[in-house]
Amino acid sequence: MTTIDARGLRCPMPTLKLARALRGAAAGEELTLLADDPLARVDVPHFCGEAGATLLGVEELQPTGWAFRVRA
């Protein structure tokens, strides 16, 4: 599983990093995006729907941020 650390980056950068990783991923491969920008909570699920990727889950990280599990 590939992990993309986009913590500290502001939107749209987390989504762009995910898009780049998905382009290089094999079908069915799972990726985890770490992001702490509040807009990512909205942007990433929307992007997954538009890109044909599957959002498997979102885990809230402490103290801030989220881990988005995505299947290519």
PLM region descriptions:
Residues 6-56:
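Amphipathic, hydrophobic secondary-structure cores in small proteins
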Residues 58-60:
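A short glycine-rich beta-strand->turn/loop micro-motif centered on a GG-aromatic cluster
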Residues 62-65:
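Short acidic/glycine-enriched loop/turn segments that link adjacent beta-strands
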Residues 67-72:
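Core SAM-dependent methyltransferase catalytic element
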